[in-house]
Amino acid sequence: MMSVEHSANSQKKVIVGMSGGVDSSVSAYLLKQQGYQVEGLFMKNWEEDDNEEYCTAAEDLADAQAVCDKLGIPLHTINFAAEYWDNVFEYFLAEYKAGRTPNPDILCNKEIKFKAFLEFADEVLDADYIAMGHYVRRTFPQNGEKPQMLRGLDGNKDQSYFLYTLSHEQVARTLFPVGELEKPEVRRIAEEQGLITAKKKDSTGICFIGERKFTDFLSRYLPAQPGKIETPEGKVIGEHQGLMYHTLGQRKGLHIGGMKESSEQPWYVADKDLKRNVLIAVQGADHPLLKSHGLVAAQLHWVDRTPITEPVRCSVKTRYRQSDIACTIIPLSDDRIKVMFDEPQVAVTPGQSAVFYQGEICLGGGIIEERI
């Protein structure tokens, strides 16, 4: 006999973002098991150089189609390449040009997966919900309260860092079936159900770059400007091929050889002098210039869409997969905050996102403007 929940779900249509990967495949399967009317939607977000071996779009679409056929659900396709170029890629290039290090995956979620996708699912496919294969969870409040976004159950795979721009309205319209599972369990389900994606490896790297070498890709769109590498005292110790290829705290790829009168400790990027096109490097992972006591962030997005008006104790991540850092948020205005860490941190990078948590709850975040 059908459960009450199963029967209520059968009136609801869910459009699943099918990427051709295991997480979205299992998401579609689980929603079908829960009784929803499930349809897939495959997005093509990148048009350039599809003839290169790096672009897996054709293979991904074939895998998504095979999974939908196996599950007996329709698959729609949509091309968001123009929206992606205008709203994600041009920002990505502008940030690199300005010497910052952006995170395009966060912008892709904001502008494409939870905006353009949601609008298309609403207007064309008449969706009640959309669903994605992200490792996050959400609450389902019964009494008119705003839903909250929670970290994924699998701490290793939690993707809330990439989704902090979502509003409670977007969270309310989205289901995250695999957020309640550990990754090995997701693969086990895919295998049990005979889904072609069960053993497919997870995609890595920025969506439009894929597996190729980042510097090669970037140089096609932004001309590199070589310059000097200096110590904080102004001593020239090497040359760089372009500031955009380097990020704060970076150790590899500096090609600074052994020098007289210097210790054997490795060199790290401590700063970028944009005016002079100079990279500043220091020796030793514990060098004080590598450490920040806090940061200033702007372009804030709070999941509940309520600005912070007084100091808040919470934790922050300044990059993906980082352990939580205890901190205090101090509001400077509705759209700017100062964040002071309990302990100094390395590699706090302007252009990256600072994302805030209270326990399991993702509060939101913003773009790092400067470090303190």
Swiss-Prot record:
CDD domains: MnmA_TRMU-like. Residues 103-105 are annotated as: Interaction with target base in tRNA. Catalyzes the 2-thiolation of uridine at the wobble position (U34) of tRNA, leading to the formation of s(2)U34. Keywords: ATP-binding, Cytoplasm, Disulfide bond, Nucleotide-binding, RNA-binding, Transferase, tRNA processing, tRNA-binding. ATP binds at residues 17-24, 43, 133. It comes from Vibrio cholerae serotype O1 (strain ATCC 39315 / El Tor Inaba N16961). HAMAP family: tRNA_thiouridyl_MnmA. Its EC number is 2.8.1.13. Residues 157-159, 319-320 are annotated as: Interaction with tRNA. GO terms for biological process: tRNA wobble position uridine thiolation. Gene3D superfamilies: Adenine nucleotide alpha hydrolases-like domains, HUPs, Translation factors. It catalyses: S-sulfanyl-L-cysteinyl-[protein] + uridine(34) in tRNA + AH2 + ATP = 2-thiouridine(34) in tRNA + L-cysteinyl-[protein] + A + AMP + diphosphate + H(+). One of its GO terms (cellular component) is cytoplasm. The record marks 134, 352 as: Interaction with tRNA. Disulfide bonds join 108-207. InterPro entries: MnmA-like, MnmA-like_C, MnmA-like_central, MnmA-like_central_sf, Rossmann-like_a/b/a_fold. It is an enzyme of class 2 (transferase). Pfam families: tRNA_Me_trans, tRNA_Me_trans_C, tRNA_Me_trans_M. It is found in: Cytoplasm. The keyword Nuclease does not apply. GO terms for molecular function: ATP binding; tRNA binding; tRNA-uridine 2-sulfurtransferase activity. The active site is at 108 (nucleophile), 207 (cysteine persulfide intermediate). Coiled coil: none annotated. This is tRNA-specific 2-thiouridylase MnmA. The gene is mnmA. Belongs to the MnmA/TRMU family.
